[in-house]
Amino acid sequence: MTTTAAGLRRTFTHDHVVTAPPDALFPLLCPVLEYAWIPTWECTLVHSVSGVAEHGCVFTTDFGDGEETWVCTTYRPPTAIEYTRVATGGWVTMLALALAPTEAGTALTVAQTFTAVTPQGECAVAAMDETVERDVWTDLSRLASVYLATGAMGPA
């Protein structure tokens, strides 16, 4: 077995609220449907039998820090969806989204585990900012709430 100096792992977990029930929110957690409510969303769908998110769905993104290949590894409507993302920059992200009903709508728990697989990835993972990651998901929760309330995309 060969080992590497990489392997740094960091996990960030945040709780958010979306003002709609889980069965309304869950379908939006999809690479195709995110175009309707996330102003900056872009992806290339590689594989999906249904044309939307499903177990085994594969797509790619590139938001300026290198391409990532996403695979949907858990698909349990309307309570859980997980994606594993492999970044060309040398890290893997496990993204787990858990949805639970509340009086306000949906409690959304976002858990992101970043694991470096190269020395370059180790630098990237070490530099990741938990506050930035939380703020991204706070904004996404706001955008989902706006879309589900109005049917229109909110401002970025």
Sequence positions of predicted segments:
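Short secondary-structure boundary/capping segments
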Residues: 4-6, 50-51, 72-73, 98-100
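A short, structured loop/turn motif at beta-sheet edges
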Residues: 19-23, 73-78, 98-107
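Hydrophobic ligand-binding cavity/cleft-lining segments
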Residues: 1-50
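Glycine-rich portal/gate segments that line the openings of hydrophobic small-molecule binding cavities
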Residues: 33, 45-90, 145-155
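Beta-strand/loop substructures that line and gate deep hydrophobic ligand-binding cavities in soluble
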Residues: 87-138, 154-155
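Intrinsic-disorder/low-complexity, polar/charged segments enriched in Ser/Thr/Lys/Arg/Asp/Glu/Gln
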Residues: 9-17, 58, 67, 80, ...
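Hydrophobic-ligand-binding modules of eukaryotic lipid transfer/binding families
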Residues: 1-17, 137, 141, 145, ...
